[in-house]
Amino acid sequence: MGSYALPRSGVRRSIRVLLLALVVGVLGTATALIAPPGAHAAESTLGAAAAQSGRYFGTAIASGRLSDSTYTSIAGREFNMVTAENEMKIDATEPQRGQFNFSSADRVYNWAVQNGKQVRGHTLAWHSQQPGWMQSLSGSALRQAMIDHINGVMAHYKGKIVQWDVVNEAFADGSSGARRDSNLQRSGNDWIEVAFRTARAADPSAKLCYNDYNVENWTWAKTQAMYNMVRDFKQRGVPIDCVGFQSHFNSGSPYNSNFRTTLQNFAALGVDVAITELDIQGAPASTYANVTNDCLAVSRCLGITVWGVRDSDSWRSEQTPLLFNNDGSKKAAYTAVLDALNGGDSSEPPADGGQIKGVGSGRCLDVPDASTSDGTQLQLWDCHSGTNQQWAATDAGELRVYGDKCLDAAGTSNGSKVQIYSCWGGDNQKWRLNSDGSVVGVQSGLCLDAVGNGTANGTLIQLYTCSNGSNQRWTRT
């Protein structure tokens, strides 16, 4: 993970306690639906619950926060695996060539071991967070420096680290499927293979992982490029044991239900998989539960690491992406994850799905052609029993279709299209369902509107200033 591990385009089930409901009549009163409580937890902490299936649930630890008693209390109680957030990276462990400094890394390692936790090593070879002396090298000199660094760090921790992220973030973003243009890549295309072979010789007992971000969606070129590399390595006997999926989910790289397929396909190559740096903008409980269940569904998924303890500890704290609030209190996402780990599938959408019918048209809110593609604009269509007209209200204020797609506003101005998009917890996917029949976007303050007061099949849906017109009033059927 690095300071740029998210795309620059921007950043996009909990316990079923209170589900927002749409009005039953035009001027009816909205009814709150109370769902049965979830299954009782067999274990009361994340690590213990994960251990029931032979997995771990870990967190990233920063040495500078180990004097914070709230931080260490939560981390000590909840997690059974630790990753040093920055302390084992290249600039921290070898600030001068050949002069290793493990003081901060050892502080994290020792705290973990003293508190009964295992440790993941992160990371040995990476284009980022290189000390100045390494940045100035190239070619064979850089290659030798990489080898020496791997040997030096792994010798210090030999037999102590259960998994190492040997290589981090070597593939380019976008649709090219190419390697990232870095100083390490320019030292020769075999640099990743050399790093893994060096690491195996340095510590045969550690699992050796490749780690990257934006590789969770099976259809993406970057994912396919990583898959092809791992397949090639396995075919040729290059010692790779596991693949880490960072899972920094956001609007530019949202959670997709095919993540489970991705994990399964990599596991089928004969490697373990792990979710290594999980954080999700807005911490939607349903998405956290889905990710947890994806890991649980794949026998070779070793476990999950969240990238920080509280929101205030996160590298993206303004996006509130973790399981604990700034004050250390648990979020709904925490409960959803714990329930999933304890065997209760919290990822199922609320069981209150139904049609949303326009008062003026008598037609239903419809996803054209039952499309599941993000960005598909909604329309009016004759009501029927298809899943593309079944909308479930969640306690987070979402309106979901197909379980993992949300009613989504593409903008905040009049005329902005209303579409489906993978649920990610943003305010543009949250709606107020009012007793007058209006459906108002939380982010925009505008109403769900049938374009041009239209009533015919195919009339598109947009946002527009609320007017109490019949094209802006809806009932639940």
From Swiss-Prot:
Q: Give GO terms for biological process.
A: xylan catabolic process
Give the signal sequence positions: 1-41
Name the encoding gene, please.
Answer: xlnA
Question: Gene3D superfamilies under this entry?
Answer: 2.80.10.50, Glycosidases
Query: Disulfide bonds, which pairs?
Result: C364-C383, C406-C423, C447-C466
Main location, first listed in the record: secreted
* Keyword tags: Carbohydrate metabolism, Disulfide bond, Glycosidase, Hydrolase, Lectin, Polysaccharide degradation, Secreted, Signal, Xylan degradation
Specify the protein name: Endo-1,4-beta-xylanase A
Q: Which family does it belong to?
A: Belongs to the glycosyl hydrolase 10 (cellulase F) family.
Is the keyword Metal-binding in the record?
no
Q: PROSITE patterns under this entry? A: GH10_1, GH10_2, RICIN_B_LECTIN
Domain spans labelled Ricin B-type lectin: 361-477
Q: Where is the active site?
A: E169 (proton donor), E277 (nucleophile)
Q: Identify the PANTHER family for this entry.
A: BETA-XYLANASE, GLYCOSYL HYDROLASE
The record's Gene Ontology cellular component field reads: extracellular region
Main role? Contributes to hydrolyze hemicellulose, the major component of plant cell-walls. XLNA and XLNB seem to act sequentially on the substrate to yield xylobiose and xylose as carbon sources.
GO terms, molecular function = carbohydrate binding; endo-1,4-beta-xylanase activity
Question: Which pathway is this protein engaged in?
Answer: Glycan degradation; xylan degradation
Compartment list = Secreted
GH10 domain location, by residue?
42-340
- EC assignment: 3.2.1.8
Q: Give the domain of life.
A: Bacteria
Can you state which reaction this protein catalyses?
Answer: Endohydrolysis of (1->4)-beta-D-xylosidic linkages in xylans
